[in-house]
Amino acid sequence: SIIKAIKDTVVYLDEINTISEAVISEAVGIRLIEQILNNFYLYYRSMFQNPLHKKATMSMDELKKIQIGNEYDLQRMLYALLVPIFPLIRQEVESDNGYGGMRADLYLEEYDLIIETKCTRASMTEKKLLEELGADGFYYKAKTVFFFVYDKKSIIKNPDVFKAAFVREQEKNGKNIKVIVLQPVEL
């Protein structure tokens, strides 16, 4: 009946309105971001390395031109992945640490969360990377800091030990720090 259809439509519209107004809680938002960072390699492989459909207008040659050359390329890709889910995320946000300025690669104010991207290069040593992350971890005032390291030059000898060296928890250290290391593997 028409009355039932109208009632069903009103219920449906109410549900859409409720969904559109839904806010992602801080815990869920942080977990989503962590999941995206941990699985970034799946996105990269699916987008740039997996075979294309035969009717696709893109070519593998075109896709192979898109590479992660440095941390700015990595930052752009992460931003593009995160902005549809977290539209308030911002890039290159300046802040004052009390002595000098700091610039967060990606910042999500609603969770007081920073994502700092690092991309290793031939001239970088593991010690230099440790020093950079240590300084950033100390100076960033955000409640949650993710370090996303794309170790394309495989300078990190033991990623698990490397990550464990930086993990901090809010209750003990006043902020959450997590490190995600992605080392490309070609067989």
Predicted segments, located by residue:
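Internal, Lys/Arg-enriched amphipathic helical interaction segments that engage polyanionic partners
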Residues: 1-32
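Long, charged, glycine-rich C-terminal linkers/tails
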Residues: 58-61, 67, 89-109, 180-184
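Acidic-basic catalytic patches of nuclease active cores, encompassing PD-(D/E)XK
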Residues: 43-91
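Domain-level recognition of nuclease-like catalytic cores that cleave nucleotide substrates
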Residues: 2-8, 152-187
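Conserved catalytic cores of phosphodiester-cleaving nucleases, focusing on short active-site segments
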Residues: 106-108, 112-122
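Nuclease catalytic cores
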Residues: 29-34, 38, 67-71, 75
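Catalytic cores of nucleic-acid endonucleases
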Residues: 119-169
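Hydrophobic beta-strand segments of well-ordered beta-sheets in folded domains
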Residues: 111-113, 143-150, 177-179
